[in-house]
Amino acid sequence: MAHVKRYRRSSKSSEEGDLDNEDYVPYVPVKERKKQHMIKLGRIVQLVSETAQPKSSSENENEDDSQGAHDVETWGRKYNISLLDQHTELKKIAEAKKLSAVEKQLREEEKIMESIAQQKALMGVAELAKGIQYEQPIKTAWKPPRYIREMSEEEREAVRHELRILVEGETPSPPIRSFREMKFPKGILNGLAAKGIKNPTPIQVQGLPTVLAGRDLIGIAFTGSGKTLVFVLPVIMFALEQEYSLPFERNEGPYGLIICPSRELAKQTHEIIQHYSKHLQACGMPEIRSCLAMGGLPVSEALDVISRGVHIVVATPGRLMDMLDKKILTLDMCRYLCMDEADRMIDMGFEEDVRTIFSFFKGQRQTLLFSATMPKKIQNFARSALVKPVTINVGRAGAASMNVTQQVEYVKQEAKVVYLLDCLQKTAPPVLIFAEKKQDVDCIHEYLLLKGVEAVAIHGGKDQEERSRAVDAYRVGKKDVLVATDVASKGLDFPNVQHVINYDMPDDIENYVHRIGRTGRSNTKGLATTLINKTTEQSVLLDLKHLLIEGKQEVPDFLDELAPETEHQHLDLGDSHGCTYCGGLGHRITECPKLEAVQNKQASNIGRRDYLSNTAADY
């Protein structure tokens, strides 16, 4: 007989009772259920527009009772107030919550900018280690004429206002409206006349007196505004002064260093220095020796000039670091440093290279930074390397030149190359065609040659001799079309370029501004045509759309329809418009694709070994 398990009656009944208690649901009256339903609905609406910081669980428990009552009062039916008054009250509450969302956005942007600003100062390793900080700018012997020194602040501001010059910084120099009043010698004036330059441009009116006075400078002006002369003429004058006081002996120098981001720009800057040096020598003044140090040229050419004593060196970062590492060149005497297109060189990719170059200086120097696109994050970071800098801004940083008519056309990817022939019919030569990829440049070049167009091409994959030959042939007018990657977009000055064609849209809007700035230079008119299609990133198209609106250009329908619902959201917050990181007008820093790419790159480099700086590419 099987054994039957027995249970105690009392324990069984208590277990059943516990189970019954667990399943028990208290009865809630209909009126109370309606009330709770109203609270629930109110909370849903409230959570949608909620922007305050989330509370801890304990705070929520404490506030539940009072919050529930408040929600009933706010969102429930009010019999003693009309529906119109209730609607007005709810609208005010929604507006208040919207304002708090804007404040939250601004607070978030401030945090991002602070995290960027917390990087190491842009100084040499020795200066950072010893905590060296220079408090006063370098003093020079140059002074403006007395009648200009005696101008009142109101008169100076009137000149700046007329020329649309914005100046920031302590006690900036007065603006001077003629080269003769800037006390340039006859040789310089002859050199200016030979190039057909009669009066200074706005950036030169304020920039030249500032640099001649020895002040550190951040110069921002649209492409083709004459920034090069602002740093070339003063360094020639300082070198001349040094040569007069004590002539340079063998292997001495340089006094001035100019760093350029590309070989073509370095070559162009060196040729400008040689032009004015020859005119000075023709007037019986000492020879100013300048040296070009860049990849693709034999080091022996630079060594020849350095061995005789060099006053000015124009260099690209890769070759410069190589020469400094090998002690071919020293910066012991260097007191003048200029970085052309500085935003590119201080940008994340080349920041360490610049810091390495700074560490070779042995004393205080006058530092100048120039570019057409200088976002706030670069300006703030660059100030760590400068002493009481003066910032001169002619037009918004990153704005396109008003002399350029911009046209944007939608063309399918497979039809682009053929469509280039139609674009070439719009204007007379010379024409510049830009493409992102080297293979696209080669493809376009080959197609144009097959169609009988006189074209040349340059990109980073070609050797230096071929690049120089192509640029020279295009510059003197032997060739009608130059096809190039962005290597030709920064700072290069080609005479009378009628038309710039963007075969594709660059990755960021700064490159677009540099590209179209090759035309419409020195108060001439130009045309820029950009071909886009579905492969183009929407964030860049939004930036382009807002750039066209800012420049009062025609916006095509396919761009006008782009993201209309986000048109007004948060683009004008606080003092800034658009993104403070990259300068794009179509987004804020919280959605910046460039910042995101930089952060991803930094994250991917975590844990990797640090490569020696002297192996850096000569970009």
Curated annotation (Swiss-Prot):
Zinc finger (CCHC-type): 577-594
Gene: abs
Residue window of motif DEAD box: 340-343
Keyword field contains RNA-binding: yes
Family note: Belongs to the DEAD box helicase family. DDX41 subfamily.
GO terms under biological process: mRNA splicing, via spliceosome; regulation of gene expression
Catalytic activity: ATP + H2O = ADP + phosphate + H(+)
Keywords: ATP-binding, Helicase, Hydrolase, Metal-binding, Nucleotide-binding, Nucleus, Phosphoprotein, RNA-binding, Zinc, Zinc-finger
Residues holding ATP: A221, F222, T223, G224, S225, G226, K227, T228
Domain Helicase C-terminal residues, every copy: 403-563
Function: ATP-dependent RNA helicase. Is essential for the directed and fasciculated early outgrowth of the bolwig nerves, as well as for its navigation at later stages. Is required during post-transcriptional gene expression. Plays a role during morphogenetic process, apoptosis and the establishment of cell polarity.
Helicase ATP-binding domain boundaries: 208-392
Region (Disordered): 1-25, 50-69
Class of the enzyme per the UniProt entry, highest EC level: hydrolase
Compositionally biased tracts (Basic residues): 1-11
Motif interval(s): Q motif: 177-205
EC number assigned by the record: 3.6.4.13
Lineage: Eukaryota, Metazoa, Ecdysozoa, Arthropoda, Hexapoda
This protein's name: ATP-dependent RNA helicase abstrakt
Matching PANTHER family: ATP-DEPENDENT RNA HELICASE DBP3 (PTHR47958)
Subcellular location per the Swiss-Prot or TrEMBL entry: Nucleus
A GO molecular-function annotation: mRNA binding
Record-listed Phosphoserine modification sites: S11, S13, S14, S56, S57, S58, S66
Example of a GO cellular component annotation carried by this entry: precatalytic spliceosome
